[in-house]
Amino acid sequence: MKESNLHSRMKRYETSSKAFLMRRTPAIIRVDGKAFHTFTKDMEAPFDERFRNAMQQTMLKMCQNIQGCVFGYTQSDEISLVLTDYETITTDAWYDYNVQKMTSIAASMATLYFAEALRAEVDAYAIRLTAEQPAPPSQFATERSNHQSSRIQGNNEYISCMRAKMFAALFDARAFSVPKEEVCNCMIWRQQDATRNSIQSVGQYYFSQSQLNRKSLSQIQEMLWTEARVNWNDIRTEWKRGACCYRDNTDSSKAHFPWIIDKAPPVFTQNRNYIERWI
């Protein structure tokens, strides 16, 4: 068998499964933590500062290192990135919008960057404890003394647990094309999911599953206020509706606009231009 014939035949098998996104159309990559319900089991509830910071830093690094990325959004254990390839007529798409390469590399990047970021967060937290300068407790840390977060907050058990699992996090990824008109709607969809996750997380912190059974989001908010005296609207914005990443182009004198993390994004349905200006 001639080597050239073997090579050609094998390449045909490989090529037949390739898929490409549509050029000159926005692309969205979303990475999700694999089995993060288990991964986050021993973290501070209802929200873990170090986990949240690590996710935001992962988003930042991905925005900085993925060609054509113009906007990032993260909530819970997921990151959504918006890519464009039409800034100029000669602008190239990231890996020619090869879906296999986009998803495999994006998942690998998220896994690596998250491990690095979480390690940095845990190490910094341990140093503060050693120096007897613990980070300020979250607004939930002392609400219920019998809750898991009260037991592990500021405790070496928490640090040991985090260090044991920091390199166990894995991410999957998907990539798809969307019309320009739908990019904002896609981010609205994810932000609405963030709001739902946030309300449910706080509800689960204070109430049992049976108490929350069949309760709507508005009913959970009412329970939080009437029974726990907690106003969900007073929670920090990044815990209610996620965080975003984009270039700071306010100073036109700069040669390169730096990427920044916005921890207090607006409600997207009320300010569509917040996203659409980048598309």
Where are these regions (language model features)?
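Regulatory and interdomain segments flanking nucleotide-handling catalytic cores
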Residues: 1-279
